[in-house]
């Protein structure tokens, strides 16, 4: 959530590498640039994907499983960066359906959401755009994958309660 000032640079790097290597190439450089710093607040002993969750066994599984610990293709990074640019652009907020009930959920230790700041930025943008039914739930200490967090039962319960409240 929120704007990422490095996004234009990332798109340029991906475009250059795609021109040289092709869109199906898997670049360790782009992976490193994309995720560098995500683990910086966490103890190295927690694993290379500690930024995803506090659940150590899930991090260990993620770190050791090639099906979940892989490098996107350059086409995948291009699509991801394009989507991030569109979803964080000023026009996105004005185009968002005003009557769509929306909840933003995030962990306060999620580096992707800038430790809560990016999610609040998105919330503020949607609020200023006039979204009528808008909620935010921040989970103290939780990281990126809330449904794989140590408090996942609480997250699921809160999401079910919110959905029941909206859908009645």
What residues fall within each predicted segment?
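Short, proline-enriched alpha-helix->beta-strand connector loops that line the catalytic pocket
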Residues: 96-102, 129-132
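Catalytic active-site module of serine/aspartate enzymes centered on a nucleophile-bearing elbow/loop
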Residues: 129-168
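Short beta-strand/loop motif that positions the catalytic acidic residue
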Residues: 104-106
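Conserved alpha/beta-hydrolase "acid-adjacent" motif
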Residues: 111-121
